[in-house]
Regions:
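Substrate-binding pocket helix/loop in short-chain dehydrogenase/reductase
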Residues: 97-98, 105-110, 136, 217
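Conserved glycine-rich cofactor-binding loop
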Residues: 9, 16-17
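Short C-terminal tail/terminal secondary-structure segment
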Residues: 146, 236-237, 248-264
């Protein structure tokens, strides 16, 4: 199967590192012009340099803006008024006992992980429907369906994002625009390395820490390892393609078999 995204513009929120940057790399490799986003201009410069090293000749736009705010979305819109592919990847996570999560933290998690995606969909979906083509993907998590006791606030936001996905898919029905979620499992990023250290201790070598984390905290995984960000990028490339035109309103999994279900 040959996937060619030449002529498409793809916006990936929260793409200065980790999963977001890996998604941008794979979309660029497939021919899309990619829009990198983050709050730090210096981090975005580094991300752009890394992407161009991995994908020479890639077409890249960099927009420093906090997309967890309405003002940040306005800044983005002024630079990138139309996109063909929207990947809502922006998100925060962290471990905290349930009773220690105060109102401000609950609110912050919702604003960053859910409301940012809603704003971007509201911003870009109308032009997609007018053009008769568009792809929207929301990066969710196994925590949406297997709520971890150490971060129920994060799990709540990812469950909400599944509902947002299905609802906007219905709103876009028959327009040529598809809207999907991608449920990702434990993924090897710098942020997850820090998270693993919080749970199993920072005195272990990485290979041992990863193995301990998977055994003690994610034993349901069928692959027994962290997922590589590129593996998520591969799914996003498919969902962004013409070949995925009949796939919408769903929650596709790149979770290493972590979620114990035969559906989807």
């Amino acid at each position: 199967m040959n996937i060619d995204l030449d002529g498409r513009t793809a916006l990936i929120s929260g793409s200065s590192q980790g999963i977001g940057l890996a998604i941008a790399n794979e979309l660029a490799r497939a021919g899309a012009r990619v829009v990198l986003n983050g709050r730090s201009a210096s981090a975005l410069d580094s991300a752009e340099e890394q992407l161009l090293t991995e994908v020479p000749g890639a077409r890249v736009i960099v927009v420093a803006a906090d997309l967890a705010t309405a003002e940040g979305v306005e800044t983005l819109l002024a630079t990138v008024p139309v996109v063909d592919i929207l990947v809502n990847n922006l998100g925060i996570f962290g471990a905290k006992p349930a009773l220690d999560i105060d109102d401000d933290e609950w609110r912050r998690y919702f604003e960053v992980n859910v409301l940012s995606a809603i704003r971007l969909i509201r911003t870009y979906l109308p032009a997609m429907t007018e053009a008769g083509w568009g792809r929207i993907q929301n990066i969710c998590s196994d925590s949406a369906v297997v709520i971890p006791e150490e971060m129920i606030h994060y799990g709540m936001t990812k469950t909400a994002l599944l509902a947002v996905t299905r609802g906007f898919a219905k709103a876009a029905a028959g327009t040529g625009v598809t809207v999907n979620s991608v449920i990702v499992g434990p993924t090897h990023t710098e942020g997850v390395e820090k998270f693993v250290a919080e749970l199993v201790g920072d005195d272990l070598p990485w290979d041992e820490a990863q193995a301990t984390f998977m055994k003690e905290h994610r034993p349901q995984s069928l692959i027994g390892r962290l997922i590589e960000p590129k593996e998520i990028g591969n799914m996003i490339v498919y969902l962004s393609s013409e070949q995925a035109s009949a796939t919408t309103g769903g929650a596709l999994r790149v979770d290493g078999g972590y979620v114990d279900s035969i559906l989807p």
